[in-house]
Amino acid sequence: WTNLQWIEWGINNGIDHGVLGAAKDNPQWFHSFRDVPNPEDNPHIFHPKEYRKGFVTPRSLETASDMAKVRHLMDDQTFTASLIGSIGMRTAMDLATHLKLADQLPTLDSIKTDPKNAIVPTSAAAKCMIVFRTLAVIEKEWINNWMDYLVRLDRVSYARRN
């Protein structure tokens, strides 16, 4: 599955809209280990060269969606723990943050097509999430649009401190 194929399936099968949004922004969740020679390059997926207690698959992401639908019944710690058990630590942390900050985040499509008007979040966590999310999936075709968007964030969001 690609992320877009899974999203199409998910729309028709009642997947939580926040999980669909995270899947759209994280195509690397759907990559095959066959396309990733070095397991460190994609810590979200199964890779036979590295033992991982958990990892994301289309099926486990459906389970995460079921949990996301009832997250209002859990505290943050319980919700995150349930995600870790189904999709692995790294993906669970990314998804939990995405769900918490989703209304502040611009879509990748809005950055690619209209970087000067894409939403700029107010929270530092959301700004950092945008930077790291984008760096994981950026392609040369839209790097100029990313740079147009990036200058709209305050320097603290992307500057490295020594």
Q: Where are the regions a protein language model picked out?
A:
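C-terminal regulatory/interaction module of P-loop NTP-utilizing enzymes
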Residues: 1-162
